[in-house]
Amino acid sequence: MQLEVRNLSVAIHRKPIVSGVSLTVGDGEFVGMLGPNGCGKSTTLRAIYRLNRKYSGQILWDGQDERTIAQKEFARRVAVVSQFNDIAFDFTVREVVLMGRAPHMGMLTRETDSDQEIVTQSLDMV
């Protein structure tokens, strides 16, 4: 899957936080965002993974504007595990990654061997 961000700008309470960010991340690539506190890294990511929908510019997943992707389909394509979480839960890293498979299953369906293999492959990449 390819991610392309074109001229992304985000303002919060009319204050510009991010201005003119463009980037491309190819299928299978890993990218790090570096910068000082308050420079807009988290704001950029929140726009990319739909936590903040108020932005200008374009965010494309495999060439498709994210605004045109249905929520369920977006959940199948993109999963986020935040660094900080206010909810105390007792899950292993593997169990949290496996939760990302939920949009690919039916309501009462359990994970399959294929899901387990996908999780193993994902964890092997990091």
Where are the model-predicted features located?
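The feature captures the beta-strand-to-loop junction immediately N-terminal to the Walker
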Residues: 34-36
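Helix-to-loop junction immediately C-terminal to a conserved catalytic motif
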Residues: 49
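Conserved ABC transporter NBD signature motif
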Residues: 57-65, 74
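Conserved catalytic motifs of ABC-family nucleotide-binding domains
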Residues: 68, 84-98, 103-109
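Conserved ABC ATPase "signature" region
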Residues: 113-126
